[in-house]
Amino acid sequence: MPALSTGSGSDTGLYELLAALPAQLQPHVDSQEDLTFLWDMFGEKSLHSLVKIHEKLHYYEKQSPVPILHGAAALADDLAEELQNKPLNSEIRELLKLLSKPNVKALLSVHDTVAQKNYDPVLPPMPEDIDDEEDSVKIIRLVKNREPLGATIKKDEQTGAIIVARIMRGGAADRSGLIHVGDELREVNGIPVEDKRPEEIIQILAQSQGAITFKIIPGSKEETPSKEGKMFIKALFDYNPNEDKAIPCKEAGLSFKKGDILQIMSQDDATWWQAKHEADANPRAGLIPSKHFQERRLALRRPEILVQPLKVSNRKSSGFRKSFRLSRKDKKTNKSMYECKKSDQYDTADVPTYEEVTPYRRQTNEKYRLVVLVGPVGVGLNELKRKLLISDTQHYGVTVPHTTRARRSQESDGVEYIFISKHLFETDVQNNKFIEYGEYKNNYYGTSIDSVRSVLAKNKVCLLDVQPHTVKHLRTLEFKPYVIFIKPPSIERLRETRKNAKIISSRDDQGAAKPFTEEDFQEMIKSAQIMESQYGHLFDKIIINDDLTVAFNELKTTFDKLETETHWVPVSWLHS
């Protein structure tokens, strides 16, 4: 039989061979019927398509591309769920329809299987009909690649056995579905582990690459798949598992910063939850302290740290009569609407750990969210607010404060102040109608809740600056406040940028402006540090006022995003 011509191109050789076969085989075919059959078979479109697929896979194998992510199917489900909460247009409807098609779901599932290399054969579990006197043994082979196994182990103090203590959601062990909490580990890659410490076994696993073979004795009870709905939390503190002596496995811990959004994957353990960062496409979870555990140990570890309302020096009583005008807060004495009934220790009862949150986007017919500005005296908060008001008087508004002071000839009721009697003011205080109030020279000044409602009712963004301990009481379904902390730059930058600026002085009755002093700078920095330390978990945004123009532009950009983009808010705001 003569040699067959296969063509010169290596990538298209098989395709050319297929096309040449009928002619090459013709001298060896006895009947015309057989020859016709060969021509029809090798000319079949489906066969040509299979050859093309083969060539594509051969090229893919040569390139060895690395998958961008391992959980495309889960990402598509999350995207579809997210789109359901968006205003539907033709493009979104088309995308939702596409993502719901079985063939697209199957394609993404196959992609994930290939990306995770989850196609190697795994030995099935041993049959259940084994002598009750003998322990049933399972031999499991997992492909770990470079990722952690996703399980923690411990030594049983009574029996000395090595037990699977925890399965991390989304990890290799979890995806296999073959290893469960309570299983006893006997061998790893043929190495007996009965007499080894957990640390030694971890080293064996860390040094193993590719396939790992386990010999295990199943526990008495296997985990049932969790059917919990998705739960998202906002972290209210920084966490580094490497600095946590209590965590059972530092390598399994998940680091996060204050303000990060985490998705809770499992709450089966009352002490250690499993979570992942919300924006992380990697499905593998990590350990974080549970809310109850973190609250308990913080309360025991730091009972001396009590969150007290910031004390304001006498120098800051400057312009107190003006403090509520444009909602300025350089007050000598002020109280929140809750402080008349609750002691200063009310703030200490709350240990900031986590807050359950949900996505929220303002609808066009909704009132604007209340914008709360917080910052130390002299940081430039009022100047930023003034620039905002000037930039768009139809869009931004401020509250008109109440006072018991006598109206002056050039003043109009309801413009500079709302003038009321002392008796009525005190009655409103008792009825908790004031967000904040204070007294200066035997006259009351205060910002009422109704004044905030009045601005919002005009379809305006209400700009309100308050003392930081008041913020928590404004966090309600009605106002949905967005809290911005205006932070000073370093003291070196303050000396450089504020050398010609002035601050309102209290050294004369008129509250005249005076140049900043070194003491002003130091007190501004110290006050900002205390605010951020005690109330930073309530801040949605931090803007450093190094340069006024830059800070103003950042503030404007923040407002634009606040009104058009999706943000995370407490669940209670939408489901109460």
From Swiss-Prot:
It holds the Pfam family Guanylate_kin. It comes from Homo sapiens (Human). The keyword Endoplasmic reticulum does not apply. Its main location: membrane. Keywords: Cell junction, Cell membrane, Cytoplasm, Membrane, Phosphoprotein, Repeat, SH3 domain, Tight junction. GO terms for cellular component: adherens junction; bicellular tight junction; cell cortex; cell junction; cell-cell junction; lateral plasma membrane; MPP7-DLG1-LIN7 complex; nucleoplasm. PANTHER family: MEMBRANE-ASSOCIATED GUANYLATE KINASE MAGUK. Residues 289-383 are annotated as: Phospho-regulated basic and hydrophobic (PRBH) motif. This is MAGUK p55 subfamily member 7. GO terms for molecular function: cadherin binding; molecular adaptor activity; protein domain specific binding; signaling adaptor activity. Heterodimer; able to heterodimerize via its C-terminal L27 domain with LIN7A, LIN7B and LIN7C. Forms a tripartite complex composed of DLG1, MPP7 and LIN7 (LIN7A or LIN7C). Interacts with DLG1 via its N-terminal L27 domain. Interacts with PALS1 and PATJ.
